[in-house]
Amino acid sequence: ECKDADGLILSVDTLLYGGLIPSRIHHETKETLLSRMELIREIRKENPNMLIYAFQVIMRCPNYSSNDEEPDYYERYGKEIHDAGVVIHKSRLGIKSQVQLSKLMDKIDQKCLNDYIGRRETNRFMNVETLQYLRDGWIDALVIPQDDSAAYGYAAMDQSSIREKVREYDMVDKVLVYPGADEVELTLVSRMINVMHGKCPKVYVKYAVEKARDIVPLYEGLPLAETLKYHILSAGCQQTESYEQADFILAVTAPGEQMQEAAGQLINHKKWYEQRNLPEMIEFLKERIKEHKIVSIADNAYANGGDIMFIHLLDKNQLLMQVGGYAGWNTSANTIGTAIAEAVDMLYNGKSKQHDNFLVERYLEDGGYCSVVRGHVTEQLPSGMNYFDVKETQGIVSDQVKQELQTFAQKTLPSIADRLIITKAAMPWKRMFEVDLEVKYCHEKMV
């Protein structure tokens, strides 16, 4: 399939392990993994002129106990394994910790911990191998996003180790290591499109509150402003301080203090969210749209869902379908990368049916499902079902999800609700975290 291609976006984790989740639970040997890497050489030899942009995630270390996407023993020891990593990392940096490492170790089965540390070592070894492939010219660009990252712990230590190798190989300007994961395919497609057009679009970042620059979003380990710089660069764009000169504007809704989970925004609204100047943000966006500027919204006010108040303001001001992009899902980094990619698509392709459909899917999934419907449906699950197991991809649960999303649209998106058709709602992993949603936007109102 690559013989006649101009470019390849390659997930090294998929090539080596079969995917992101399999990369956390595999028992592959280094020899097997190294043999799989050889495919990259074969592809390069067959099509020497094809651009190859690769990405490979640093294995995460969640701060909770669950085996939903981790090894089985993580359900019992996950929190303790994470906390032990934090204490070990701080100790190496000369930072005192209030928790004694010995007490944590007493709670963890040593065989399980050895397995976990061994898998991390194998994955880190393969991260370095991929760096060598870049150094030797087998791939053209490499991004190493850190999945569900934090400032301290096993994942942060791995990141430091990999950064040392990047410096040793003199590739600081070639390898980007930053918070993210699920959005990186979109980011690299954006970069490839920009490179093939010979352009480096200018991006102006508009904050809802200036203090947001310095916050460290949930599940990440860098200040927001630095993560934004990485994502803009990784997408083949450049940041500008002048919105007049910008090719598109990235509107960022993050708070000026600690980020909260989206599911609690309607019942436990934190006062510091009031520091955001949303009226000024809306007026700014309206004026830029009048000037025919592309505006894309990175709705990272909360983690794991969109800001219902902000979506309401977009609806109230007839802006929902005038913006060039919207995202508000999972981590702040996932949201940022998606919003940038939407803007790049709009820059080259303009408005399209596919773009509009994706936009309304974001409003219903990121705002509707993630922030409101997911929690409500979870509370009403039939006997025998729970958040992690709803027994089916389509059925009682997906039907209720679809019905509640339609209600959400009528209540929160009234300016476009009668133009939306939900053609699919399914639970692809038979759990509540994700929904497989397909929505069509009709330019004419439905009778």
Regions found by a protein language model. Name each.
Residues 1-447:
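An N-terminal assembly and electron-transfer interface module characteristic of large anaerobic redox
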